Amino acid sequence: MPVAAIIREEIEIPESVTIEVINNEEVVVKAGGKELRRILSYPDVVIKKEDNKVVVESLYPRKKQAAIIGTFASHIKNIITGVSEGFEYKMKIRYAHFPMKISVKGNEVIIDNFLGEKHPRKATIMEGVKVKVSGEDVIVTGIDKEKTGQTAANIEQATRVRGRDTRVFQDGIYIVEKAGKVL
């Protein structure tokens, strides 16, 4: 049973951003020398550019198509925000007894001396994401929200304490601010 005759979501395009829609499914967003591509494909959901807007719509959608339209619109808004402003995650290094040494080598974050361990722990940095370590702060920046968030999560998970009481062993690297929201 269709939800409505047509469901349509419109996204305004800022002046500094150019958007191209290829074959009603691939979205290419460019701004300030940065570019992001994303394939957003689902049956009966159409993405097109009209004047100064990107339109995501479906004729006679079911519940699933109606939900996907909102999801695709959010993805496009995040891509526009990413190429125009970028995303930044702020993390704090916390330790009680063993001071950690954090360094960035290639596409990995190396965490030395975590809880006094002899072998370093490693976290993967996703493509197109930059990690900067300064004192007790770790800043993760990038234009792709998903890759930036995944890199921050990789760093946080690399310092997860296993087999010990987490109320006592609070050492680790924790996300304190993500995409402008203080946690």
Curated annotation (Swiss-Prot):
GO CC terms, sorted: cytosolic large ribosomal subunit
GO MF annotations in UniProt: rRNA binding; structural constituent of ribosome
Q: Name one Pfam family in it.
A: Ribosomal_L6
Which SUPFAM superfamilies does the record cross-reference, listed alphabetically? Ribosomal protein L6 (SSF56053)
Which InterPro entries does the entry link to?
A: Ribosomal_uL6-like, Ribosomal_uL6-like_a/b-dom_sf, Ribosomal_uL6_a/b-dom, Ribosomal_uL6_arc, Ribosomal_uL6_CS2
Keyword tRNA processing on this protein? no
UniProt keywords (A-Z) are: Ribonucleoprotein, Ribosomal protein, RNA-binding, rRNA-binding
| GO BP of this protein | cytoplasmic translation
Under the subunit heading, UniProt states: Part of the 50S ribosomal subunit.
Q: What does this protein do?
A: This protein binds to the 23S rRNA, and is important in its secondary structure. It is located near the subunit interface in the base of the L7/L12 stalk, and near the tRNA binding site of the peptidyltransferase center.
Q: Which family is this protein grouped under?
A: Belongs to the universal ribosomal protein uL6 family.
What's the protein called, per UniProt?
A: Large ribosomal subunit protein uL6
| Name of the gene this protein is made from | rpl6
